[in-house]
């Protein structure tokens, strides 16, 4: 979420792409919860103009599924096809089954992926953290797991019926993993992702602090373990940052009132390397596939290294550790559950199209 245009007090294209370079990412996909929403050619062109002016890494914009992301009327998908990586209303679930079916039919016709934030508003009931032990013992309103997996089950059925290429954003529950695993066995064209925070933290780690609040929320140990199992057996195709910056004020209101979302561009690789490669859970090559190759394959972006061609390269020191200090981030967002955690794997340099766009001062 690069937040520009419309929410530049949270993040800008410049600061967000600098954060990406600092974290070792050469390509990022920009979600459409902007103002104006990229739901037609004109609003998308405004976003593209700003990307051309300010981005220091490759930015691939999403087009919105619905007009204004209101979930009522299909956006002008045809007009946006040449410039968008996929279509999504990320940040909101598409509540209407008929609209989702129409969107999938159009995406199949256009040869584009539909990526969904799955959340059934009827089941939210004002919740803002996982509906588990912590919510009950600390008198918080919980978000039930079914609000996610119920909509995934609906969408998988629609994808099977329409033949749409369907992608599930930020999976967080064990039921979601099971539904997607079974869909893949049936041959449904579905992929999914999760984020480092869902693979690392659970509701047991919650504190009364906005840096632990995101959507979907941190779930139970069982859910976290199911996500890891999904990585190992191939059900979960990729790990993404779900970088969602907010202002300092918006994240300083505790669990109940803080905005939902945490930053991730500058910690994601190191967090996953520390949790999975160092202890031998995953080989480095598998992590690279989850964070780089698989997204490139699915979404059709990026280029391969070739002699004589401008290169996108990232240099990491995999033996160097550091303590996460959010005040050192290049992102305007500071809220992360990894604050104060020691991680291994430091990005030393990022090169885009043969030009160094970020490097450590001591390099």
Segments (PLM) and residue ranges:
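Active-site mouth loops of central-metabolism enzymes
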Residues: 1-11, 32-34, 60-73, 91, ...
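Histidine/acidic residue-rich metal-binding segments in metalloenzymes
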Residues: 74-239
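Divalent metal-coordination and catalytic microenvironments
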Residues: 20, 24, 59, 87, ...
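C-terminal cap of metal-dependent C-N hydrolases
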Residues: 254-257, 307-362
């Amino acid at each position: 979420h690069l937040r520009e245009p419309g929410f530049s007090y949270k993040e800008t294209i410049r600061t967000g792409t600098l954060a990406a370079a600092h974290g070792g990412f050469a390509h990022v996909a920009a979600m459409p919860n902007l103002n104006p929403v990229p739901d037609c050619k004109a609003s998308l062109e405004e976003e593209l103009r700003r990307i051309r002016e300010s981005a220091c890494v490759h930015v691939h914009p999403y087009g919105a599924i619905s007009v204004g992301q209101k979930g009522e009327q299909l956006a002008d998908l045809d007009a946006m096809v040449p410039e968008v990586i996929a279509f999504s209303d990320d940040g909101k679930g598409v509540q209407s089954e008929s609209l989702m079916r129409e969107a999938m039919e159009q995406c199949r016709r256009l040869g584009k992926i539909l990526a969904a934030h799955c959340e059934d508003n009827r089941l939210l009931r004002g919740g803002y953290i996982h509906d588990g032990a912590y919510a009950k013992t600390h008198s918080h309103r919980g978000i039930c797991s079914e609000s996610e997996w119920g909509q995934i089950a609906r969408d998988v059925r629609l994808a099977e019926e329409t033949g749409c290429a369907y992608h599930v954003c930020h999976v967080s529950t064990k039921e979601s993993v099971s539904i997607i695993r079974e869909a893949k066995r049936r041959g449904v064209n579905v992929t999914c992702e999760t984020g480092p925070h869902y693979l690392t933290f659970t509701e047991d780690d919650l504190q009364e602090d906005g840096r632990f609040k995101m959507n979907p929320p941190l779930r139970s140990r069982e859910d976290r373990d199911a996500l890891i199992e999904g990585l190992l057996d191939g059900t979960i195709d990729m790990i993404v940052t779900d970088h969602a910056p907010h202002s300092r004020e918006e994240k300083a209101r505790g669990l109940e009132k803080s905005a939902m979302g945490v930053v991730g561009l500058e910690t994601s690789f190191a967090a996953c390397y520390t949790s999975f490669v160092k202890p031998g859970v995953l080989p480095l090559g598998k992590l690279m596939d989850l964070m780089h190759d698989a997204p490139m394959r699915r979404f059709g972006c990026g280029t391969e290294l070739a002699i004589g061609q401008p290169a996108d390269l990232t240099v990491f020191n995999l033996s160097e550790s550091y303590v996460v200090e959010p005040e050192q981030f290049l992102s305007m967002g500071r809220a992360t559950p990894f604050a104060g955690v020691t991680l291994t794997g430091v990005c030393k340099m990022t090169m885009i199209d043969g030009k160094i766009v970020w490097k450590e001062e001591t390099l």
